[in-house]
């Protein structure tokens, strides 16, 4: 395995995990679901380092509840046990930066959410090489290179 610094660091949005965990609950096309599986496999194998924000777990939990699905605790344990993935606590500075990013990107035509701001703020704070998402609001940001999971090779 290569040195950690030589492997790209990707900030991962919840939709990457949800596409694999509960594909029937996502609006993502099949190529994005397959791409999400490739991304998570690369993290698991150590070819890609991942980082996300603790809101990830809240978003995943919500979908499990909304879809009335069992298995959240198993998914959570797997995420928390993954050695190539860091899930950051939401600190005051991260929360404030997320609000500032929301102010920058939100408009009537772009419903950039506070959660979107948390993912972007996390990626920027951790100096991620890219942010992988299917969210059109995040794919249009200028602060960080973004990639659809289907584009990850």
Regions found by a protein language model. Give the residues of each.
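Short, well-structured N-terminal submotif of metal-dependent ribonuclease cores
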Residues: 1-52, 65-74, 136
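Active-site neighborhoods of divalent-metal-dependent phosphate/nucleic-acid chemistry enzymes
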Residues: 3-5, 85-130
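Conserved glycosyltransferase catalytic-site signature
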Residues: 14, 54, 113-117
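A generic structural signal for short hydrophobic patches within well-formed alpha-helices
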Residues: 17, 57, 95, 138-139, ...
């Amino acid at each position: 395995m290569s040195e950690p610094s030589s492997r790209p660091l990707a900030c991962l949005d919840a939709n990457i995990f949800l596409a694999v965990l509960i594909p029937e609950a996502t609006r993502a096309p099949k190529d994005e679901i397959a791409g999400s599986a490739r991304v998570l496999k690369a993290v698991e194998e150590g070819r890609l380092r991942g980082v996300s924000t603790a809101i990830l777990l809240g978003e995943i939990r919500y979908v499990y509840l909304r879809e009335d699905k069992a298995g959240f605790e198993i998914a959570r344990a797997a995420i928390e046990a993954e050695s190539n993935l860091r899930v950051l606590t939401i600190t005051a500075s991260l929360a404030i930066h997320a609000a500032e990013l929301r102010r920058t990107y939100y408009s009537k035509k772009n419903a950039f959410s506070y959660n979107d701001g948390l993912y972007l703020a996390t990626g920027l704070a951790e100096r991620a090489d890219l942010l992988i998402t299917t969210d059109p609001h995040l794919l249009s940001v200028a602060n960080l290179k973004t990639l659809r999971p289907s584009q990850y090779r």
